[in-house]
Amino acid sequence: MGGWIDEEHRGVRYGLAGDVLVEETSPFQRISVIRSERYGKGLLLDGCWMTAEQQERHYHEALVHPALCSAEAIERVLVIGGGDGGTARECLRYPEVIHLDLVEIDGRVVELSQEHLPGIGGAVWSDSRCQLTVGDGIAWAANAPDQSYDVVLVDGSDPAGPAEGLFNRAFFEHCRRILKPGGVFATQSESPEAFREVHVAMVRLLREVFGHADPLYGWVPMYPSGWWSWTFAAVDGPRYRTVQPARAALVAEGCEIWSPRWQQGALDAVPAFIARELAP
């Protein structure tokens, strides 16, 4: 392997030993594809780790299954971001999903993922239920009809560059508007250690917009601090805390990280310093 490939954040480096296979700049960001000794091929955007073949389930399972196992219906799903295909792949494991809109702003992320990381997207790209749109997910949410989706998932990068607008009130209000009754919204919500201020602000804002929102904590070892979060929100009570057993039974055996038991523990694993900051 050629050397160390590092992500730098606030005076700390997070690195993998490996080789750079592709490095290019799209109209939106710098994209790198690497081959690492530890986690296989991986993707970086603007120098930040996004995903890798042997790590992606830590992230994708945590984002998808608490939402799809708890929403009242899951026929129509919107995924904003997620150009590697991993989030859509986990969603399409549910036969109840009839239509999934995958809206990714950077077409090169999709193309490079299909070429170099085909195992992450799997059969998504040929599944007739998945409609890929290369475009702005923020504009998509703003223009979508009221109550048009059962589940809305935001699989974006950190709050900078093209993903910055995925973290503000106007966007979250549109996500609430397009969610059907009984629906669930979910988003990656940064690290409570490496991005503490952003994380706390996101959870507070989602509670204001939706009425009910709670973070779930897990680990993604290649991300800053290794400790990550996903926040789930709903209008009609914290339904994301109640797993539907029949749906869970369909997917649990194929999961490496998620299970109903893991989900319960991860939702309850709020550290004291975060609980104090989130207290009314």
Curated annotation (Swiss-Prot):
What's the domain of life for this entry?
A: Bacteria
Primary site of residence: cytoplasm
Which processes are annotated in GO (biological process)?
Answer: spermidine biosynthetic process
Instruction: Name the residues that bind S-methyl-5'-thioadenosine.
Output: 29, 104, 136-137, 162
Q: Name one GO molecular function term.
A: spermidine synthase activity
Identify which residues the record assigns to the active site: 155
Q: Name the chemical reaction catalysed here.
A: S-adenosyl 3-(methylsulfanyl)propylamine + putrescine = S-methyl-5'-thioadenosine + spermidine + H(+)
Q: Which UniProt keywords apply?
A: Cytoplasm, Polyamine biosynthesis, Spermidine biosynthesis, Transferase
- Under which pathway is this protein filed? Amine and polyamine biosynthesis; spermidine biosynthesis; spermidine from putrescine: step 1/1
- Which residues make up the binding site for spermidine? 60, 84
Question: Cellular component terms, GO, for this chain's entry?
Answer: cytosol
What are the EC numbers?
2.5.1.16
Q: Where does the record place it?
A: Cytoplasm
Alphabetized Gene3D superfamilies for the sequence: Spermidine synthase, tetramerisation domain, Vaccinia Virus protein VP39
- Keyword Glycosyltransferase set for record: no
**Domain called PABS: residue spans:** 2-235
Task of the protein: Catalyzes the irreversible transfer of a propylamine group from the amino donor S-adenosylmethioninamine (decarboxy-AdoMet) to putrescine (1,4-diaminobutane) to yield spermidine.
HAMAP family the record matches:
Spermidine_synth
The record ties this protein, via NCBIfam families, to: PRK00811.1
Q: How does it assemble?
A: Homodimer or homotetramer.
Its family remark reads: Belongs to the spermidine/spermine synthase family.
- Name recorded for this polypeptide: Polyamine aminopropyltransferase
User: What organism does the record attribute this protein to?
Assistant: Parasynechococcus marenigrum (strain WH8102)
